[in-house]
UniProtKB/Swiss-Prot annotation:
Similarity section: Belongs to the glycerol-1-phosphate dehydrogenase family.
Cofactor: Zn(2+)
Cofactor: binding comment: Binds 1 zinc ion per subunit.
SUPFAM superfamilies documented for this protein: Dehydroquinate synthase-like
Keyword Zinc: yes
Described function: Catalyzes the NAD(P)H-dependent reduction of dihydroxyacetonephosphate (DHAP or glycerone phosphate) to glycerol 1-phosphate (G1P). The G1P thus generated is used as the glycerophosphate backbone of phospholipids in the cellular membranes of Archaea.
Catalytic reactions on record: sn-glycerol 1-phosphate + NAD(+) = dihydroxyacetone phosphate + NADH + H(+); sn-glycerol 1-phosphate + NADP(+) = dihydroxyacetone phosphate + NADPH + H(+)
Protein localization: Cytoplasm
Pathway listed: Membrane lipid metabolism; glycerophospholipid metabolism
Residues that hold Zn(2+) according to the record: 167, 247, 263
Keywords: Cytoplasm, Lipid biosynthesis, Lipid metabolism, Metal-binding, NAD, NADP, Oxidoreductase, Phospholipid biosynthesis, Phospholipid metabolism, Zinc
Signal peptide from the UniProt entry: none
Stated name of the protein: Glycerol-1-phosphate dehydrogenase [NAD(P)+]
Length: 346
């Protein structure tokens, strides 16, 4: 049996914080609610969301600092102890992922209120949490609603929007890997999920100039593409439409680096290299990332070239059951170095 779950409402516009109450009413939510935010996102939007919700609901709040299993358990404990009926995550990937898994484990719905458009977790069922063995994604449930305030997302540093493009563009190689796994391993493949995923990537490539400007229209396009990516994963019932070898490379960097770059920045560079391995137009991908201001080299990413090579050689071990262009044995050091050099990453 294949159950597809999607957000029931997506609100995308300017100054939509006040909509949180209306969304909650339409979804028949009751008190109490838990507002989850980070130290920074509390000031950016968290306090305002809290204030609006207090007009109609009993509100609890909690600060989350990192995407670890300890933080998930802390939030889950607050939900259970206070008999919280629903949660709202106000923040970036860390806050959304922790709230997603904690609410799933506690059996309550959650609303996603992204303050950046840096990765496709804003509407997907998957959460990346450290402390579960390796930092790969774990399946939970997607948000029942997404409330994206363009004014808030636009005010975030520009690199976040560029990282969002990096995460969406990785759908190109992810779908290639998925097709490969279908052909070689007989893995389930959904044409519909793949088409939606690729459409999201093609949209950001087509609109790179608009996104580069970073105005309302550019933000809107990236947010829509990220949400479509999340929906594609829900249709597939896995992260396959948006996560292939380029994500394994990013997870490898997470393990090797004390302070990794943004997820979408890493997957963007991974996509350039994996596109080269697939024999598809990696130059066009690189060009798009350059246009929007995303890093395309190890230097721009702030990572030693040696680490890039090592990440490429261990990427296949991150999730052995996920078949990709890297195959079962992965890349040799020579092949990894050659791919990174030819694409200009190192």
């Amino acid at each position: 049996m294949h159950i597809m779950e999607f957000p029931r409402e997506v609100i995308l516009g300017k100054n939509v914080i006040s909509e949180t109450v209306n969304v909650a009413k339409r979804l028949s939510f009751s008190s109490p609610v838990l507002v989850v935010y980070g130290p920074k996102t509390k000031e950016i939007a968290g306090k305002d969301v809290e204030r609006v919700l207090k007009e109609e609901f009993d509100v609890h709040s909690v600060i989350v600092k990192e995407a670890t299993i300890n933080e998930v358990e802390k939030v889950e404990g607050i939900i259970r102890d206070n008999k919280v009926k629903w949660a709202i995550a106000v923040g970036g990937g860390t806050i959304i992922d922790v709230t997603k898994l904690a609410s799933y484990r506690a059996g309550i719905p959650f609303v996603s209120f992204p303050t950046t458009a840096s990765h496709d977790g804003i509407a997907s069922a998957n959460a990346s949490i450290k402390g579960l063995g390796t930092k790969t994604s774990i399946k939970a449930r997607p948000p029942v609603a997404v409330i994206a305030d363009i004014r808030i997302i636009k005010s975030a540093p520009r690199r976040y929007l560029a990282a969002g493009v990096g995460d969406v563009i990785s759908n190109i190689t992810a779908v290639r890997d998925w097709k490969l796994a279908h052909k070689i391993k007989g893995e389930y493949f959904s044409e519909y999920a793949a088409a939606l995923s690729l459409m999201s990537a093609k949209m950001v490539m087509r609109d790179a100039e608009i996104i580069r400007i970073g105005d309302d229209e550019g933000v809107r396009k990236v947010v829509k593409a990220l949400i479509s990516s999340g929906v594609a994963m829900s249709i597939a019932g896995s992260s396959r439409p948006a996560s292939g070898a380029e994500h394994l490379f990013s997870h490898a960097l997470d393990l090797l680096l004390e302070k990794p770059a943004l997820h979408g920045e890493q997957t963007g560079i991974g996509t350039i290299i994996m596109a080269y391995l697939h024999g598809i137009n990696w130059r066009k991908i690189k060009e798009t990332l350059q246009k929007v201001g995303a890093p395309t080299t190890a230097y721009e990413l702030g990572v030693d070239p040696e680490i890039i090579i090592e990440a490429l050689t261990i990427a296949h071990t991150i999730r052995p059951e996920r078949y990709t262009i890297l195959g079962r044995d992965g890349l040799t050091r020579e092949a990894a170095e050659r791919a990174a050099k030819i694409t200009g990453v190192i």
